[in-house]
Amino acid sequence: MSIHIGAKENEIAQTVLLPGDPLRAKYIAENFLEDAKCYNEVRGMYGFTGYYKGKRVSVQGTGMGVPSLSIYVNELINSYNVKNLIRIGTCGSLQPDIKLRDIVIAMSSSTDSAINKIRFNGMDYAPTASFKLLKKAYDKAMELGIQPKVGNILTTDTFYNDDPDSWKLWAKFGVLAVEMETAGLYTLAAKYNVDALTILTVSDSLVTGEATTAEERQKTFMNMVKIALEIAE
């Protein structure tokens, strides 16, 4: 057991899907995995291990933001020897051609978080996806008839920004979408020499102001889940 994850040795698979919402983790386990067993309920952050097409896979909620995700990723890697981490979550579109429910695969993640500034003594680090997982996800999406958008995203620490137009600068430089975790995930994956990828579904658009409901975000954004499960090793 680790501090925040109550699993015993060998209860977590080498590939873990990482939704921010623990209820989404529960939904995925109940609707996609066979023989799913709950290994964690600490702080209500559900974790399950089961099988998808014969492959052993875990799904672990992380909570919102880089600090919360970093706790779970550190413990999954260092206490449970996890090798493949696939974040599945929602994002806000920053581009007019990226619509609600589109799939975004994060090739890299810019960030306004200070966490890497502190880690790298004020210098800039470029958090980047595992090419192995990225290529597999892109190829699988195309095979499934899903056209993903692939590129740089923004990981932000601020959900409610005092400047409602701050996103426009990032959009000008081609950033596809905004969320709150990926830069932390990719940095830790690089630090510990494991593979990580983020696959996102667009839940709202900063360009048009459109948005989906909370219930829809929890239960119907399943193309990203299918892609993630299909590339699990």
UniProtKB/Swiss-Prot annotation:
Pfam families: PNP_UDP_1 (PF01048)
Site entry (Important for catalytic activity), positions: R217
Species classification: Bacteria, Bacillati, Bacillota, Clostridia, Thermoanaerobacterales
A GO CC term attached to the entry: cytosol
Annotated family: Belongs to the PNP/UDP phosphorylase family.
Stored InterPro entries: DeoD-type (IPR004402), Nucleoside_phosphorylase_CS (IPR018016), Nucleoside_phosphorylase_d (IPR000845), Nucleoside_phosphorylase_sf (IPR035994)
EC number: 2.4.2.1
Top-rank taxon, per record: Bacteria
Protein name, UniProt field: Purine nucleoside phosphorylase DeoD-type
Subunit structure: Homohexamer; trimer of homodimers.
General function of this protein: Catalyzes the reversible phosphorolytic breakdown of the N-glycosidic bond in the beta-(deoxy)ribonucleoside molecules, with the formation of the corresponding free purine bases and pentose-1-phosphate.
GO BP field: purine nucleoside catabolic process
